[in-house]
């Protein structure tokens, strides 16, 4: 769609982190936003991400589904507590308060993508989702990370393809 400057890029089904990489590399904008395809976070929420980053509130705007009380059917109890655990662990490791490490909704400058990828390669960081790599890279390079609350709804598209695997080094 030329009016809205939207491109649709078909990936090869290799997972979220590769799909995000493909999307970022094919984008033309100054900023990049990530929104998971299940639409459990609504597209309309991206306006607040753009506003936050464009006025300089942060270098990485990270969606947080855990600031507001999630819709009862939106997140399994195991996932909720797992997200809480990872947020606390990564907050402790990074000395940066993060309330949700696995919310797929994020916004950053496109030029920062190369820095995130360099961090991943230099540290042999393997993250199947890409969220941890983005967060750790931003913290490592001293970026201002801002959690932005989002409403999290029951998915309206597809079924999860995520397996319960942990990232590793």
Question: For each of these PLM feature ranges, what is it?
Answer:
Residues 1-9:
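Acidic donor-binding segment of Leloir-type glycosyltransferases
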Residues 2, 54, 139:
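Anion (oxyanion) recognition and catalysis
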Residues 11-26, 31, 43-124, 128, ...:
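Acceptor/aglycone-binding surface of glycosyltransferases and processive sugar-polymer synthases
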Residues 39-41:
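Acidic metal-phosphate-binding loop of nucleotide-sugar-dependent transferases
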Residues 123-124, 135-153:
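Catalytic donor-sugar/metal-binding loop of nucleotide-sugar-dependent glycosyltransferases
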């Amino acid at each position: 769609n030329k009016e809205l400057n939207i491109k649709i890029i078909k990936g090869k089904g290799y997972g979220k982190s590769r799909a995000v990489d493909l999307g970022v590399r094919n984008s033309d904008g100054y900023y990049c936003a990530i929104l998971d395809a299940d639409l459990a976070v609504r597209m309309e929420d991206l306006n607040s991400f753009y506003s936050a980053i464009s006025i300089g509130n942060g270098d990485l705007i990270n969606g947080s589904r855990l600031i507001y009380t999630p819709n009862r059917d939106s997140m399994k109890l195991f996932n909720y507590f797992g997200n809480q655990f990872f947020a606390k662990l990564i907050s402790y490791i990074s000395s940066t308060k993060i309330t949700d490490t696995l919310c797929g909704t994020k916004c950053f400058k496109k030029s920062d993508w190369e820095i995130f990828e360099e961090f991943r390669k230099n540290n042999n960081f393997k993250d199947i989702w890409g969220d941890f790599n983005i967060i750790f890279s931003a913290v490592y390079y001293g970026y201002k990370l801002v959690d932005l609350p989002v409403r999290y709804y029951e998915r309206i598209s597809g079924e999860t393809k995520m397996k319960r695997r942990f990232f590793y080094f």
